[in-house]
Amino acid sequence: RLAYTRNTLNRKQFASSGNFFECKVSYVRGKELTFPGSTSIIDDTISKNHKWLSIQLEALSFPFQKKQVVNWGLHFKSVLNSQSLFANYTASMLALPGLNVLPDLDTYFIPAYRSTQYVCAGTQLIVSPLKNIDLRLDAYGFFPIIQLILNPDGTFTYAKPLDGRSVLAAGHVIYHSPVGPVRATINYLPKYAQPFQFQ
């Protein structure tokens, strides 16, 4: 695995100034061993070797560096992955890179936001009415280039490019305490069973 990172952000989480750029190149090689369960459409144990190349790019920039009440940032993330399919849909989805431009996306398993190859871009609007208090609105467009879909008969296939495109957003009230951020968040994830989530 190779990685290059340049980071001048003012905070590890919920930054409001600075720039971030990261490029990761990974080569993955492994062996899949699948034992069919009681609901599997596959009868036999499957053993299969896998190898793939993954390239991940991420950039976050706050163009106006001066301290001010209102600030905004531009955020971009992309994954290009040559991963082969696993024996079943769930195993394939678990191995795929998930979208995590919003903090709470790491706590959910949402197949619609997992893709072999995708581009995601958005903006972060930040209002700081008081010291250590931020009101934030993060809004993104998600464009999956290659995405798996589950068929009614239990098989799976690739969707048409950009077929699963979506918008997603989150609003936050954040207090930057000495030990880390304390926040109240409402997420809008239209591809999730309950699109509005409060954290």
Name these PLM-found stretches.
Residues 134-138, 172-174, 181-188:
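Conserved active-site loop/cleft motifs that coordinate metal ions or position small ligands
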Residues 66, 153-155, 179:
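Intrinsic-disorder/low-complexity loop/linker signature
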Residues 44-48, 108-112, 157-162, 185-189:
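Outer-membrane beta-barrel domain signature
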